[in-house]
A protein has these predicted regions:
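Short hydrophobic beta-strand segments
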Residues: 1-4, 13-16, 118-130, 162
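Short beta-strand/turn micro-motifs composed of small residues
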Residues: 3-4, 63, 85-87, 125-127, ...
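Short hydrophobic/aromatic-enriched beta-strand-loop microsegments
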Residues: 61-62, 100-105, 142, 179-183
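Short active-site oxyanion
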Residues: 78-83, 121-123, 158-161
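Conserved catalytic-core segment of nucleotide-activated headgroup transferases in glycan assembly
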Residues: 90, 96, 102-151
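A charged, aromatic-enriched C-terminal amphipathic alpha-helix characteristic of glycosyltransferases
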Residues: 189-213
Length: 213
């Protein structure tokens, strides 16, 4: 069974998010369900996105929030859960709840590449507005926020430099943008290596094979 972005519990919240619905967790969940999970052999259930109360035994659970790990505390009440983290530093923060592993973030490279455009603009911040709270940027920085993904990718592609983290940073690199750091937790943009969804499949398969012996 797969609990994902289509689950009624998530959709109820999703419809109330406004511009916040265009978030990385939603699109990563879509790619997990479409491009990765069907190619991984396991008898475990899957949880690809966070919804309060949506946990289950013997499952693979994808962690999206690297800031507020306490939200995942209820997982410790469930048996045999594997927590998949997209950032190495998150692993030790959540392993008190269940077995935690690191799977590098990946994107659908070919899908992103179709939005590549000529570079005609300078610098932009790309991501949710909340991630830049209490941070200051130069006056010439544009802000690409609250946009549907395809529109965002096309706009981002026109910039030479982009402030971004996570999958957004990987997408920027696919589009030929130079990624600049802005989050003090991730001072080195080289953390965000370009990896296609297909490359993540054997890594995740190997992790689960090792876990399940």
């Amino acid at each position: 069974m797969i609990y994902d972005h289509n689950a009624p519990g998530y959709q109820k919240v999703y419809q109330q998010m406004g511009a916040g619905r265009w978030n990385g967790a939603y699109y990563y969940s879509k790619e997990l369900v479409e491009n990765i999970i069907p190619k991984v052999k396991t008898d475990r259930d899957w949880v690809t996105i966070y919804v309060l109360g949506m946990f289950c035994d013997h499952s693979v659970y994808f962690i999206h929030n690297n800031n507020s790990q306490a939200m995942y505390a209820p997982i410790k009440l469930y048996d045999d859960v594997v927590l998949v983290c997209g950032v190495p530093s998150t692993v030790p923060k959540v392993e008190r709840y269940a077995r935690a592993v690191y799977l590098p973030l990946s994107v659908d490279v070919e899908y992103v590449r179709q939005f590549k455009r000529r570079k005609t603009r300078g610098v932009a911040y790309v991501g949710r507005a909340g991630k830049r709270r209490n941070l200051s940027f130069a006056p010439d920085v544009d802000f690409l926020e609250g946009m549907p993904r395809d529109e965002l990718l096309e706009e981002m592609s026109r910039y030479r430099q982009v402030y971004a983290v996570g999958r957004c940073a990987i997408e920027a690199k696919v589009l030929g943008c130079e990624v600049l750091p802005f989050d003090p937790r991730y001072p080195d943009p080289s953390l965000w290596q370009v990896m296609d969804n297909s490359e993540a499949v054997p890594i995740l398969q190997g992790i689960l094979d090792e876990v399940d012996g």
